[in-house]
């Protein structure tokens, strides 16, 4: 496992080491080796802050084991010629890598665009763009590349690209870049848990160029991979098994155009044969061993694997429920080699989430026939309860609104009354002053007459 890590793209290499350490992978010596590898990646590119540096240092310091080259972890430094060739591959310089390792994806894209102006290979640039979008978890942009590929692969565009190619470039390299972009599209769907899209797109892309796709699936990765070959093949197998109905497995494995693919993706062909023969216990042993071991340790795929793992078991439970109106949890547990409690919990969740016509009574799973009318009545009852709840909430809101309006009206009425009282008092005061003034004028007139 450890000796394979250098095949990854440095960003995935770094994240995988951190993921393994966080998940308590391996014994003390293996963890120390991982910590040392992480520090080597950090030191490979100076001038950036790694968020995992303390994690790597702790793994090394916690171990008293001596880490030697014999352990299979001799990683050359940045000055190593072979490693320099890896980092320079596809116009990736130290500055771009520092931005990627620091999570500064927009800055990395800007530098990548600057480099691409000197590169006449649009598909190489598109391939690097897809990688950065996956690093930044912008899967929608990755999936939109399918439309860009369709435009770029039109006849007139292909002719122009062929004319622009430098002597060192060839059509085979371009085709490999195109196929890798398509595989990144499939990977983005799997990461999102969209297994049907992952599977259907892969077979579509495979039929479009089986020769180049087979070359990628059988060639050794070059130290710039997002997924190792076992991870890529297992992802294809898992998405196929989860998304395609069981009654279509026989038809799928019989397609002549896919014969070479099934020979190469051996884990898929073995799984299909076991499922077609209803050897579920043997299949689940394979599922819980090879599938689990490969995908659970993969930094990009481990979270979506957890969902796929549950869905596949649900499909097998459904198969048994279709065959029998009555069966027991203990029978399924023994037949499938799964713990009793796990089977019971999964079956209960399946019946509830899928609204199946089954009920669980202790150990017994029984079919309970329900008419369309019963289902309709239950739906109407649920809707009625929901409507009544909404009406009750609305009544409470209306009552509060009435109280608020009544309070406001009362306050307004009291304010008006106070205002009228104040006006009346003021008018009376004005009248009294006028009377006094009038009386004063009369007295002055009387005094005038007496004087005369």
From Swiss-Prot:
Keyword Aminoacyl-tRNA synthetase: no
InterPro entries in the record: PCI_dom (IPR000717)
Localization terms from the record: Cytoplasm; Nucleus
GO cellular component, one term: cytoplasm
Domain PCI: 205-374
Subunit structure: Component of a COP9 signalosome-like (CSN) complex.
Function of the protein: Component of the COP9 signalosome (CSN) complex that acts as an regulator of the ubiquitin (Ubl) conjugation pathway by mediating the deneddylation of the cullin subunit of SCF-type E3 ubiquitin-protein ligase complexes The CSN complex is involved in the regulation of the mating pheromone response. PCI8 may also be involved in transcriptional and translational control.
Identification of the protein by name: COP9 signalosome complex subunit 11
Native source organism of the sequence: Candida glabrata (strain ATCC 2001 / BCRC 20586 / JCM 3761 / NBRC 0622 / NRRL Y-65 / CBS 138) (Yeast)
């Amino acid at each position: 496992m450890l000796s394979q890590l250098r095949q990854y793209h440095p960003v995935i290499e770094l994240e995988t080491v951190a993921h393994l350490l966080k998940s308590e992978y391996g014994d003390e010596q293996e963890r120390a080796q991982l910590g040392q590898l992480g520090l080597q990646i950090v030191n490979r590119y100076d001038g950036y802050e790694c968020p995992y540096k303390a994690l790597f240092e702790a793994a090394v310091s916690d171990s008293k084991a001596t880490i030697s080259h014999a352990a299979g972890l001799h990683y050359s430094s940045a000055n190593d010629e072979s490693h320099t060739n890896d980092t320079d591959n596809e116009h990736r310089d130290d500055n771009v890598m520092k931005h990627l390792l620091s999570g500064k994806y927009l800055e990395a894209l800007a530098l990548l665009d600057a480099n691409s102006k000197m590169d006449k290979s649009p598909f190489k640039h598109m391939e690097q763009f897809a990688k950065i979008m996956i690093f930044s978890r912008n899967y929608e942009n990755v999936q939109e590349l399918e439309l860009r590929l369709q435009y770029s692969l039109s006849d007139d565009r292909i002719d122009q690209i062929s004319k622009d190619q430098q002597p060192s470039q060839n059509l085979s390299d371009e085709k490999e870049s195109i196929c890798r972009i398509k595989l990144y599209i499939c990977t983005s769907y799997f990461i999102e848990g969209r297994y049907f899209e992952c599977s259907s797109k892969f077979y579509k892309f495979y039929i479009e160029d089986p020769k180049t796709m087979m070359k990628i699936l059988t060639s050794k990765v070059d130290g710039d991979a997002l997924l190792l070959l076992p991870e890529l093949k297992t992802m294809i197998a898992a998405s196929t098994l989860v998304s395609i109905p069981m009654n279509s497995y026989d038809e799928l494995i019989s397609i002549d155009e896919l014969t070479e693919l099934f020979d190469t993706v051996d884990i898929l062909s073995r799984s299909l044969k076991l499922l077609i023969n209803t050897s579920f216990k043997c299949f689940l042993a394979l599922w819980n061993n090879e599938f689990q071991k490969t995908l659970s340790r993969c930094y990009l795929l481990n979270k979506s694997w957890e969902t796929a793992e549950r869905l596949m078991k649900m499909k097998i439970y459904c198969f048994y429920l279709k065959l029998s109106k009555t069966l027991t949890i203990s029978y399924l547990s023994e037949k499938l080699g799964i713990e009793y409690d796990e089977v019971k919990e999964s079956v209960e969740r399946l019946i509830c989430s899928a609204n199946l016509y089954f009920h669980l009574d202790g150990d017994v799973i029984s079919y309970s026939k329900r008419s369309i009318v019963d289902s309709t009545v239950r739906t109407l009852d649920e809707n009625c309860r929901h409507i009544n709840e909404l009406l009750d909430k609305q009544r409470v809101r209306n009552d509060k609104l009435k109280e608020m309006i009544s309070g406001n009206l009362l306050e307004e009425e009291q304010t008006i009354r106070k205002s009228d009282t104040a006006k009346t008092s003021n008018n009376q005061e004005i009248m009294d002053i006028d009377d006094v003034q009038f009386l004063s004028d009369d007295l002055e007139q009387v005094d005038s007459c007496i004087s005369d």
